[in-house]
């Protein structure tokens, strides 16, 4: 994997504005969707880089790793240390979220996408889309970058230049990429 030095880095204390000097190096993760965790209406591409919610339940084994009630899927690899980032391309569809989850995140039953459930995420929701400039939506897809600084307990989201930092307590647990996809949504790991 390549090491990248970021030109811009954001911090909540600075109002989400880019800082002039990056605080170190980050390792780009080659993230793949873990089809054994995918909710039954999610279809993972053969190369495991794209997932789509087709809205129709697929015939899949009901294994313990699979999300049973929420249209979610996890990615790999997982992280227990270091500074990592991954990028995800999204379309103009609504109802999606991208982030990180504790490896022990609840798989059976409905999830609340909150830190108390070991999920740190950002995305596009229906009400946000109604408030969004329609010209922006017509431009097509965008990109969200998720940064993890495990030792500092920080998850940083850069969604098309809008940066948010979330403080997290991982309690030594492995964290993995996390995705929520509403009906018709497709996401691609870059």
Swiss-Prot record:
Signal sequence extent: 1-20
Compartment(s) where it occurs, according to its Swiss-Prot or TrEMBL record: Secreted
Residue ranges constituting the B30.2/SPRY domain according to the UniProt record: 21-127
Propeptide residues, chain positions: 128-190
GO cellular component: extracellular region
Tissues where this protein is expressed: Expressed by the venom gland.
Keywords on record: Neurotoxin, Secreted, Signal, Toxin
Keyword Protein transport: no
UniProt cross-references to SMART domains, sorted A to Z: PRY (SM00589)
Gene3D superfamilies the UniProt entry points to: 2.60.120.920
GO terms assigned for molecular function: toxin activity
Chief location of this protein within or outside the cell: secreted
Transmembrane parts of this sequence: none
Purpose of the protein: Neurotoxin that produces dose-dependent hypolocomotion and hyperalgesia in mice. May directly act on the central nervous system, as it is 6500-fold more potent when administered intracerebroventricularly than intraperitoneal.
PANTHER family: E3 UBIQUITIN-PROTEIN LIGASE TRIM (PTHR24103)
Family label: Belongs to the ohanin/vespryn family.
Protein name: Vespryn-21
Organism: Drysdalia coronoides
